């Protein structure tokens, strides 16, 4: 039986509310459960990066120490994002620091006056504090949408592959602007799926900061994923419990492969690099 117009409208509202509820629950699962689980499974193997990776053509060739070389493609995403401005002698905040590999590398390589890594994952912060003993580097547990710092505390804020999980992304942008000093920068890299790109663009356009640059980096991230293929296999084997390998590993590999294909083929996913400045 065909729905009447008011019934269709009500049905649309219900579907919209259901989608909002699903997205809220999914974000809560990732923020409160999944990443703590990942820390529990991956910390014993000293996994200090959780991003997709990045490589240019021709290759970037960032000089790395032997101890950093095996994390090259993860590091290069951090390097390309952070070097949009000069961080030497600056006070830097990273929101969504994960397992701290990027924070450690940038502190050692770019010589900021101080570097603070913030994450909501308490297990991850405990791991970072134990794993990364670098002068000028510290880690704080906290919420990206309620940054636990005074106004105008930092010269730069770094945010990489994290904001797609924030329930109130505009609130995050407002908090970044609040803790930045005048003239400070947001150095930002993340992705959105097709259904969220228009909203993302509108939210960034309304940000209380001026956009200095933006760049689509799908090809570079896909290339990084290709170079890290062995890492993905090892991580999936570590994350999926042994009893579930027979039925859960293949779907996990397929999800990663679909993301790679979408980035490589110009599909529905867009990964972008941005630089913003506070007036």
Name each model feature, range by range.
Residues 219-279:
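Conserved Class I S-adenosyl-L-methionine
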């Amino acid at each position: 039986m065909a729905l009447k117009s008011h019934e269709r409208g009500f049905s649309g509202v219900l579907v919209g509310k259901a989608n909002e509820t699903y997205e809220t629950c999914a974000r809560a699962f990732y923020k409160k459960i999944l990443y703590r689980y990942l820390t529990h499974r991956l910390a014993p193997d000293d996994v200090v990066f959780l991003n997709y990776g990045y490589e240019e053509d021709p290759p970037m060739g960032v000089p790395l120490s032997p101890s950093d070389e095996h994390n090259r493609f993860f590091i290069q995403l951090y390097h390309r994002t952070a070097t949009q401005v000069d961080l030497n002698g600056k006070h830097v905040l990273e929101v969504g620091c994960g397992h701290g590999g990027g924070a450690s590398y940038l502190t050692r390589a770019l010589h900021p006056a101080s570097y603070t890594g913030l994450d909501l994952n308490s297990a991850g912060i405990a791991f970072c504090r134990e794993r990364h003993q670098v002068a000028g580097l510290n880690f704080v547990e906290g919420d990206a949408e309620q940054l636990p710092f005074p106004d105008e505390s930092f010269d730069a804020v770094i945010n990489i592959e994290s904001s797609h999980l924030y329930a109130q992304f505009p609130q995050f942008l407002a908090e970044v602007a609040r803790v930045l000093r005048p003239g400070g920068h947001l150095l930002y890299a993340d992705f959105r799926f097709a259904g969220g790109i228009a909203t993302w663009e509108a939210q960034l356009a309304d940000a209380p900061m001026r956009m200095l640059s933006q760049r689509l980096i799908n090809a570079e991230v896909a290339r990084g994923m290709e170079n890290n293929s062995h890492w993905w296999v090892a991580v999936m084997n570590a994350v999926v419990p042994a009893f579930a390998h027979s039925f859960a590993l293949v779907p996990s590999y397929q999800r990663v492969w679909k993301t790679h294909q979408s980035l490589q083929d110009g599909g529905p996913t867009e990964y972008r690099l941005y630089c913003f400045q506070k007036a």
